[in-house]
Amino acid sequence: MRKRVYKFTSAQYGISNLEKKRLKLSTIEDLNDPFDLCPLDTTDPAVSKAANAVTSGVWKTKAILCFSRNWDNLLLWSHYGDSHKGICLGFDIPVGDPGTNFDTDVIYQPNLLQIRGPEDVNFDLANRLLRTKHESWSYEQEVRMFGLLSDPPDAKGLNWIEFGPDLLLREVIIGAQCHPTVSKDVVEAIKPYGDAVKCWWAGMRTDAFLLVKQDHPPHWHATVR
């Protein structure tokens, strides 16, 4: 069983991902939420010390890849899709397969996690820390994958995960404000995938603040030279 998740990116990096069939894994330094990975009340110094020991150990060996369950969120396009000038990659990933690191839905809540003391810092808590965020982030509808940093990084110090059975590219959605020339480059990058990957354009509804998938470029593309 699989489910569809979405990765927003600029057109430049998206085209590179399509051509090289891979996505970049993020380290803790790349994350944009200072509470990420330790959403815990650490008023007690003993709790703080124990939690830090757990989380620092995790991030010596793991990296993260973030997706959304939705492709049509206007804010996600603005924040991660280069202000609607980028693209969105749709992947099918395994659901509930213990052999993978997928299907980790983020939990959103109003308050920090609470524990009685350092004796409660264990594997189960570490798992909750990895997937708990403040409710203000709930618009992202985030799904996380955790990968190992066992392979050496590339020359720029970056780690990657290859497209494959557990990261199956199924669709590419071109942003509503993507320039026609860039759109053509995206289409060319998709061609080697054949019928396995569907290309869409994000269209703007005329009667609501909503995006829709279209199988053709928006009409305004024809007026741009």
Predicted feature locations:
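Partner-binding and oligomerization surfaces adjacent to conserved cores of proteins
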Residues: 1-225
